[in-house]
Amino acid sequence: MNIKIVCVGKLKEKYFKDGIAEYVKRMGRFAKVKIIQVPDEKAPEKLSPAEMEQVKEIEGKRILDKIKDKEYVYVTAIKGKERTSEDFAKELADLTTYGHSDITFVIGGSLGTSNAVNKRADDLISFGKFTMPHQLMRLVLVEQIYRAFMINSGSPYHK
């Protein structure tokens, strides 16, 4: 299985980098994991709704350039479907069973993802109604993917 995580912006904090690197290393026995960072669009603090959409569109094009046609795509979104860890693990197992060996996860920038990115998604996934910094979302996402692998392997990691 190939897991790709496409995210907007650079990860600066060492503690996030270290945590993500640890989970990516642990997942090595289950999947090849690749994290691709696309540049965030520089914008002033206060934006009009039209300017927000423009920023999302620019970032969206950068995201879509990193996604291939055959990939199954999850986009993280507050309005996405919430799942339990067990449900998510079953979904990943089912995807591989039914021929999806290339799975891509998208984490948008601080304004979210464009309509074009959301339309490309095979599924919108939510990790709750809370708003999180996208840097933290990367760590949460890789931990949940790792947890899914551990559930599917029967490991006691998930109790």
Curated annotation (Swiss-Prot):
Its main location: cytoplasm. GO terms for cellular component: cytoplasm. It comes from the Bacteria. One of its GO terms (molecular function) is rRNA (pseudouridine-N3-)-methyltransferase activity. S-adenosyl-L-methionine binds at G108. InterPro entries: Alpha/beta_knot_MTases, RlmH-like, tRNA_m1G_MTases_N. Its EC number is 2.1.1.177. Gene3D superfamilies: 3.40.1280.10. It is found in: Cytoplasm. Coiled coil: none annotated. Specifically methylates the pseudouridine at position 1915 (m3Psi1915) in 23S rRNA. Belongs to the RNA methyltransferase RlmH family. Homodimer. This is Ribosomal RNA large subunit methyltransferase H.
